[in-house]
């Protein structure tokens, strides 16, 4: 769904580094592409506009872990929880688990994002299982292993573009990283 082009007049805009006063934000396809003072109308201005927060590592919310309940209902709970608490965008995360759990999570993410294109879900963060067992942190050792080229290609294929991040230990990857195309 293509977002409409819009213009917003803003008394106080925080751009992430500094506060700008009395500006006009021009938005195209859902993105701010121009900020200027030309044409500012105080009668149409919002008092304050700030960027939204983004949570890049979310295992679950409201008593639903994605690894335990890899379904649309869990993602709806995550989305609702984050919006109620001031975070618009979120990245559901699956830690080191068997591929079956990762695949079910991917399927839920694909379905949720396709059914809710305006949601705050930005894709799945696959955190493991391709870690160095000596540096596993809180990950379950039984699920940590070195990936094969086949395993990498399979998870990428199943993702259909819905993996937004993969956390791995580069020293355990024996496959040419140029083969990975998300």
Predicted regions and their residues:
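N-terminal metal-binding scaffold of metallo-dependent hydrolase/deaminase domains
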Residues: 1-39
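Short amphipathic alpha-helices and their capping/turn segments at secondary-structure boundaries
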Residues: 39-46, 105-118
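Divalent metal-dependent hydrolysis catalytic cores, especially in the metallo-beta-lactamase
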Residues: 59-63, 76-105, 119-132, 159-173
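Alpha-helical scaffolding segments of alpha/beta enzyme cores, especially the outer helices
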Residues: 77-80, 104-111, 150, 154
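Short acidic, glycine/serine/threonine-rich loops at helix termini
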Residues: 102-104, 134-141, 177-178
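Conserved phosphate-binding/catalytic loop of the ribokinase/pfkB sugar-kinase fold
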Residues: 132-157
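Conserved small/polar residues in nucleotide/adenosyl-binding loops
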Residues: 180-182
